[in-house]
Regions:
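Start-transfer (signal-anchor) and selected internal transmembrane alpha helices
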Residues: 1-38, 243, 247, 430-431, ...
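Transmembrane signal-anchor helices characteristic of membrane glycosylation enzymes that use polyprenol
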Residues: 16-52, 57, 251-265, 450
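Membrane-embedded helix bundles of polyisoprenyl
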Residues: 27, 129-143, 147-232, 244-267, ...
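Membrane-interface coil-to-helix junctions
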Residues: 30-136, 155-177, 270-275, 282-309, ...
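Periplasmic/ER-lumenal interhelical loops and adjacent helix-loop junctions
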Residues: 53-72, 97, 104, 244-336, ...
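Membrane-interface micro-motifs in multi-pass membrane enzymes
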Residues: 94-99, 118-130, 156-184, 191-192, ...
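Transmembrane alpha-helical segments
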Residues: 132-139, 179-191, 219-227, 317-320, ...
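Contiguous transmembrane helix-bundle modules in multi-pass membrane proteins
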Residues: 213, 335-342, 354, 360-451
Length: 451
């Protein structure tokens, strides 16, 4: 007989607080390890590149401009909106909006002296990652995932390849990680007939923070809404579509109107820029790209010329294999994963999601979020397999290892290490059951002590 641990579970509000507390503690621990690795190598989160050459000067300038604007308001003077020190002279709002002029978090620059801006920028990177995990947990719990699975999914989401590789080079790339889950939660509210406040606020926040990522999030939101509508209503209830569509569009326009002060000038400037209008031949990806992409699913070091940082932890990718090992379950999630994987293999998708410009998979944070959500969904049953499901899992694992490393581009040290960890996790699934039980026990005991 399988041993079970019986323990009184906290109430709903108490359990929510315990979940946030557990996430905060683990996030602080892992972030401390991450920061220690940088410190031991004599580095900080501010990497040479756009972070140092663009985002750091922006934050220094923005803090100075905010303080000057506050003095102008208090004295009745005009707030400066043009600066001749930017190039040969440029509009301040239009020039700086890409870097987060409308992002509420960047308003902290007004209270930090210029000499402390480096620490502020590093702190904002950590804060955005923390908020990304909180937003993911809210979305995951709304869709019925367990607290323990949600906790694992949030950590897999936050410490994936995208924030490590792209977020440190361009801190603004972290914005959609916490804005997009809020947009999805707002969409769920509209489907369920709830208040549109969250939907409007999420639209406005994303559009204020960065126009390009708002565009990507909007396209992906449409795909999400189509999937939810198809599952909820189906093709036989199309009479519900017009009023629902009117609500989605109408409330989205309200959110866009709120953000118009930075959104419209930024969009005009962006669409008129030479870089944005740059066209390149969108030839098919090389044959080995599929194998290279699979090999890098379990590593944070995968890189190509298209910003395809799709790596997650080995545990998260094991969740994907478990998902497909169990037939006739979570069909929508399976279709979603295959659909987004297909988009990563089509260069035209990267062009469309990059504003119909050059090919770039900067939307891959959504793929990472999906894999983290899959881990949260399958976590309760990750150690409970029927004999057929167990055979399916190891067959998928064998296929992955063969396919991922059949070309030399995929046989990197980090990819091999990630695959090795994946195999070890799959082989030690019985021990994982005991470890999961102990972790759940510790989780509820900590909740009881904390509350």
């Amino acid at each position: 007989m399988q041993n079970t641990i019986l323990i009184h579970a906290p109430g709903r509000r108490q359990g929510r607080g315990a979940l946030v507390l557990a996430y905060t503690a683990l996030f602080a621990l892992l972030m401390g390890i991450w920061a220690a690795i940088f410190a031991l190598n004599g580095q900080s989160f501010i990497q040479y590149g756009d972070t140092l050459k663009q985002h750091y000067p922006f934050l220094v300038y923005y803090g100075r401009w905010l303080r000057q604007a506050a003095r102008c308001v208090l004295t009745g003077a005009a707030v400066p909106t043009w600066d001749f020190s930017i190039g040969y002279g440029a509009d301040i709002i239009t020039t700086l909006s890409y870097y987060g002029l409308g992002d509420p978090l960047d308003l902290l620059a007004a209270f930090v002296p210029g000499r402390w801006t480096e620490q502020l920028l590093e702190g904002l990177i950590v804060l955005r990652l923390y908020l990304a995990g909180l937003a993911f947990m809210a979305f995951s719990r709304r869709h019925g995932n367990s607290r323990f699975g949600t906790l694992l999914g949030a950590l897999a989401y936050v410490f994936s390849a995208w924030p490590i590789q792209a977020g440190l080079i361009e801190p603004v790339f972290l914005v959609p990680m916490y804005c997009f889950p809020l947009m999805l939660l707002g969409a769920d509210d509209l489907f369920e007939g709830r208040s549109p406040v969250l939907y409007i606020a999420a639209i406005a926040l994303t559009a204020l923070s960065n126009f390009l990522f708002f565009y990507m999030a909007a396209v992906l939101l449409v795909l999400y809404a189509i999937a939810v509508y198809s599952k909820r209503y189906g093709a036989k209830n199309l009479r519900t579509l017009p009023p629902l569509l009117a609500k989605f569009i109408g409330f989205a326009l309200v959110g866009i109107a709120i953000s118009a002060v930075t959104l419209l000038p930024t969009a005009q400037e962006l669409f008129g820029s030479a870089r944005f209008g740059l066209t390149r031949e969108t030839a098919p990806y090389p044959f080995y790209r599929f194998f290279e992409l699979l090999a890098n699913m379990t590593t944070g070091m995968g890189y190509d010329a298209y910003s395809t940082y799709a790596g997650v932890t080995s545990a998260a990718f094991l969740g994907v294999l478990v998902l497909f090992a169990k037939p006739r379950q979570n069909t929508v999630l399976k279709c979603a994963w295959l659909g987004l994987l297909a988009l990563l293999l089509v260069p035209q998708a990267g062009s469309v999601l990059n504003g119909i410009s050059y090919v770039s998979n900067r939307w891959v944070w959504a793929f990472t979020m999906l894999e983290a959500f899959i881990l949260a969904r399958v976590c309760p049953g990750i150690t409970a397999f029927e004999p057929k499901e167990k055979r399916n899992l190891f067959a998928l694992l064998a296929i992955y290892c063969v396919v991922a490393f059949c070309v030399k581009q995929g046989r990197t040290e980090t990819a091999l290490l990630g695959a090795l960890l994946l195999v070890l996790l799959a082989v030690c699934w019985r021990q994982m059951a005991s470890a999961a039980a102990v972790c759940r026990l510790f989780y509820w005991r900590a909740a009881a002590l904390a509350w």
